[in-house]
């Protein structure tokens, strides 16, 4: 049988390995290279060749043990050299540990990105030749829990968040053989420099003044401060909680929701001129000009029965819908909850693989991990969300 001999240094062999993996050489050749590399490293550790008599000898050879090693070309079965003193450890397995950690991190990343545990297991097996069970992937995701909890409860007192945007996302959770609807309250904070951050989330039993007050107190207990404007839809419980939790703070009613509410009170047919007139009001970024336009519209349409309810609704909610022009430097990104609506859509896209969470803990873990991921994208972005200088 042909013998393969290596005359290269360990560093050179390591370099060959790295390039070999990239070139998809056969597993047999790569196994031979790894085994020879480890043999060379044992010789260097002992400072004596096999059967060599020398005063520099540090230990004795002590056979081998088998160990699996996962690479991009598949799983290799290696013969790992041992020494009598038990202190020798090939550098290959320092890389192995990093490889394993990278593989696990990749599995977690796939999970957070919206890949089911079944698909994660299949992808890992196809890429690495290594079989992992769905239960292993599920248990691995539990490692996210302490990270999510720490992030979810981090202090907010280092910054001021003058602009606070809130919304709720509904999910399904299994409890005692029942499938229940749960509300995930989410808050985005925008700094005076125009940076956006996801500053908190909390899963509760529903949307009411009580649950929103609990959520706001959770934010304040973590150090939320400097709030000047809260942007949200007009859910009664939410608005009441805002008034209760944030005194001397303005509320910006989401203009998108407000327009939608107004238009639901008018006929779909033969109402184009009224619709365009209402939309025109919301193009103003000066509250005084908008107010004048609103008053003219009401004067023109209030006596028409089919528009009377819409006019009353517009008049009643107008001031709240234009608070961003007073407290938000009239910046268009503060006049609606579009930002948090898009965030919810991204969370929904990733969590829909679950459909029904087995318990609230798993829901908190996945949604928290997704929000952490999106939060990192925001804070490391080179672009500000709002440029208040313009």
Swiss-Prot record:
UniProtKB keywords: DNA recombination, DNA-binding, Plasmid, Transposable element, Transposition
InterPro entries noted in UniProt: Transposase_mutator (IPR001207)
Domain of life of the organism encoding this protein: Bacteria
Example GO molecular function: transposase activity
GO biological-process terms attached to the record: DNA transposition
Positions in coiled-coil regions: none
DNA damage as UniProt keyword: no
Cross-referenced Pfam families: Transposase_mut (PF00872)
The family this protein is said to belong to: Belongs to the transposase mutator family.
Function summary: Required for the transposition of the insertion element.
PANTHER family recorded: TRANSPOSASE FOR INSERTION SEQUENCE ELEMENT IS1081 (PTHR33217:SF7)
Name this protein carries in UniProt: Transposase for insertion sequence element IS256 in transposon Tn4001
Organism: Enterococcus faecalis (strain ATCC 700802 / V583)
